[in-house]
């Protein structure tokens, strides 16, 4: 029989920030969820994807899914 898929779910969080009305910078809070095979990919994922909060393509970096 075939082995069960060894992929993990990871969270890709936007690196974009937005200035609030009080003047402080905060993350947009937008994220994507992707599958990743830890045996093939040892480094952290980074993608340039669309962030609808800032309406631009920005860098998304991998974080652990809680």
Curated annotation (Swiss-Prot):
Domain of life: Bacteria
One Pfam family of this chain: Ribosomal_L33
UniProt GO cellular component terms: cytoplasm; large ribosomal subunit
InterPro entries: Ribosomal_bL33, Ribosomal_bL33_CS, Ribosomal_bL33_sf, Ribosomal_zn-bd
Keywords, in A-Z order: Ribonucleoprotein, Ribosomal protein
Name of the protein in its database record: Large ribosomal subunit protein bL33
PANTHER family documented for this protein: 54S RIBOSOMAL PROTEIN L39, MITOCHONDRIAL (PTHR15238), LARGE RIBOSOMAL SUBUNIT PROTEIN BL33M (PTHR15238:SF1)
GO molecular function, one term: structural constituent of ribosome
A biological process term (GO) from this entry: translation
Natural source organism: Wolbachia sp. subsp. Brugia malayi (strain TRS)
Family of this protein: Belongs to the bacterial ribosomal protein bL33 family.
């Amino acid at each position: 029989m075939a082995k069960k898929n060894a992929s993990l779910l990871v969270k890709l969080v936007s690196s974009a920030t937005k200035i609030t009305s009080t003047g402080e910078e905060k993350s947009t809070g937008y994220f994507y969820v992707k599958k990743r095979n830890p045996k093939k990919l040892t480094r952290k994922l980074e993608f340039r994807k669309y962030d609808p909060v800032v309406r631009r393509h920005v860098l998304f970096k991998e974080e652990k899914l809680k």
